[in-house]
Regions:
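A SIS-like phosphosugar-recognition module
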Residues: 165-166, 177, 204-248, 252-255, ...
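Conserved short alpha-helical segments that host acidic/polar catalytic motifs at enzyme active sites
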Residues: 1-246, 250-251, 259, 265-296, ...
Length: 605
């Protein structure tokens, strides 16, 4: 949720760190800070600021020089946003500096013990506990000081530590919060996200939980928190720095909405097998015999990924005839769920680092379950923990609000459902039908986006609403849920989603002219049922915007979406509602790429 970036080498470090923080702004934050040193400098120099990275940059003095440093963007969990609570945190003797992502669960107990020993705390944060533990250690090496501190803390962390007496190194560690190393020419980088690294290096090493690393300018080594050396194999990142630029768009959200046709083309590329009307998904590590033995599918995700999973569950039931359902990972991991060896579990996450999803995967693995991962970021924690899976190949998604990753996740589920179906009873004819539908998607997405001006005008009207209702039935219901989430995320307009079949069971009491209803009305076997719901709303003077394949007489306005196969329609029907949310937020002057109180990757509980 926060962002870490660090560097050790020969270059002037402050501009590098500030640039790295700017590339991590999309993760969400409320304050920022930086600390630097060099072999020729006595001690550590630090600057912190509440607000944006530009506020921090304005406070950094011209003579703030160094060749080693760490920096951080903070998203408050312990203590309000302020200069004092911003990271890095420094020891009383100004020798130890720490940046930290995660939550120290036993921070309160440790703080009391340290205060009883005379330690004075300056901030309200849990991170400051780590600083004092490292500073008070009597170990000779910085690595051992950090190891001793980590031995007594409980919780999650991704940390980077500097010490004035060891200014030739940065020590980092990971447990439940991502840490990525970047390997350069006689220089090393560290970050919580590869977005901060790709402008400088494509060679990365991702630390595992329970792993530490020492970074020097011309070398690095990795080891467990117990001190055992580990082998680090660098991987090459395919994403380019240009992928993180806006490319002429006003916001990343707008850019990423318009990248969806190309993104869908990428997730399909090389996977379709026309000869057998199926798809190649070698990364599943699941052969035909094992696929036929699956008796149930359980999909776990959070937020938008959960909604993609809801759509995926319906696709799997329809095409593979396997009972399937989706559940928020944040709920699943806290109940004593029955783990069935004949159930295939699928974890969905854009970042591959979502804490609740990762924790659910780890618990399932502990109980012997087979788990697949559907993620966007190559080499992420879920990708490494899972038995197999699929990359959705959406490319970097910078806006906090997910658009193209959601779409590519739903396409990935369509591919998986087709694959499972063809190992069972799905006919060649139906396999071919779905493949033809998948191939139409990029062109149909482009067609939807060509109606942007029409949707923009509608959004300017809806910006006046205080609340909105979204409805859909069966395939349309997850689309309604995701559209509702998008609107509230970026516009801050209250929105709720209900199955259209549930209108009589409560939501009808809300219907009035001031409450717009957005209805998902696909031209499928439930068309007349959906039209009946529109009749009920209209009879109570409700205003209706329909998203449909043909004009709806009872709706005040209709956004026409091109028709695909029934099973694939949900992939398309949410895209105009992404634009609706975007332009509603724009009309209200919202910070679209960085909505208040939200973060891109939720890596804490």
């Amino acid at each position: 949720m926060c962002g870490i970036v660090g560097y050790i080498g020969k270059r002037d470090v402050a501009p590098l760190l500030l640039e790295g923080l700017q590339r991590l702004e999309y993760r969400g934050y409320d304050s920022a800070g930086i600390v630097v040193t060099s072999p020729k400098t006595a001690g550590l120099k630090m600057v912190k600021a509440k607000g944006r990275v530009r506020d921090l940059e304005a406070k950094v003095p011209a003579r703030f020089k160094g060749t080693t440093g760490i920096a951080h963007t903070r998203w408050a969990t312990h203590g309000a946003p302020s200069d004092v609570n911003a990271h890095p945190h420094m020891s009383a003797d100004l020798k130890v500096a720490v940046v930290h992502n995660g939550i120290i669960d036993n921070a309160s107990d440790l703080r009391k013990k340290l205060e009883a020993d005379g330690v004075e705390f300056l901030s309200e944060t849990d991170t400051e506990v780590l600083v004092h533990l490292v500073a008070r250690s009597q170990a000779d090496k910085l690595e051992d000081k950090v190891r001793e501190a980590l031995r007594v803390v409980e919780g999650t962390y991704g940390i980077a530590v500097m010490h004035a007496d060891f200014n030739d190194r940065i020590v980092v560690a990971r447990n439940g919060s991502p840490v990525v190393l970047g390997i350069g020419e006689k220089e090393m980088f560290v970050a919580s996200d590869i977005a901060a690294l790709v402008a400088h290096t494509r060679q990365i090493v991702t630390l595992d939980d329970g792993e530490m690393a020492t970074l020097k300018a011309d070398d690095f080594r990795t080891y467990t928190t117990e001190g055992t050396r580990t082998t680090a194999e660098p991987t090459t990142v395919e994403w380019e720095a240009a992928s993180y630029d806006m490319g002429g768009h006003d916001t990343y959200m707008h850019k990423e909405i318009h990248e969806q046709a190309d993104a869908v083309d990428r997730v399909l590329r090389g996977r379709i097998d026309d000869r057998f009307s199926t798809v190649h998904l070698g990364g599943l590590n699941l052969d035909a015999r094992e696929a036929r033995q699956i008796r149930r599918v359980k999909i776990l995700g959070c937020g938008t990924s959960y909604h993609a999973g809801m759509i995926g569950a319906q696709m799997i039931e329809e095409l593979a005839r396997i009972p399937a359902d989706a559940e928020p990972a944040s709920e699943f991991r806290y109940r004593n769920a029955v783990v069935d060896p004949d159930t295939l579990y699928i974890a969905v996450s854009q970042s591959g680092e979502t804490y609740d999803v990762l924790a659910a995967v780890q618990e399932l693995k502990r109980k012997g379950a087979r788990v697949l991962g559907i993620v966007n970021v190559v080499g992420s924690a879920i990708a490494r923990e899972a038995d197999g899976g699929m990359y959705v190949h959406a490319g970097p998604e910078v806006c906090v609000v997910s658009t193209k990753c959601f779409t590519n996740m739903t396409v990935a589920f369509a591919l998986l459902a087709l694959h499972l179906g063809r190992t069972r009873d799905l006919s060649v004819r139906d396999g071919k039908r779905i493949i033809e539908g998948l191939r139409k998607l990029p062109g149909q997405i482009a067609e939807i986006l060509s109606r942007e001006e029409e949707i923009k005008k509608l959004a300017e009207e809806f910006a006046e609403a205080r609340s909105m209702l979204f409805i859909g039935r069966v395939r349309g219901y997850p689309v309604a849920r995701e559209a509702s989430l998008k609107l509230k995320e970026v516009s801050y307009i209250h929105a709720e989603a209900y199955p259209a079949s549930e209108l009589k069971h409560g939501p009808l009491a809300l219907i009035e002219p001031a409450l717009p209803t957005v209805a998902i009305v696909p031209n499928d076997d439930l068309l007349e049922k959906n039209r009946a719901a529109l009749e009920e709303i209209k009879a109570r003077s409700g205003r209706i915007l329909a998203v449909a394949h043909q004009d709806q007489e009872k709706a005040d306005q209709t956004i026409i979406v091109p028709k695909n196969e029934d099973e694939l329609d949900p992939i398309l029907m949410g895209i105009p509602l992404q634009l609706l949310a975007y332009y509603t937020a724009k009309a209200l002057g919202r910070d679209i790429d960085k909505p208040r109180n939200l973060a891109k990757s939720v890596t804490v509980e």
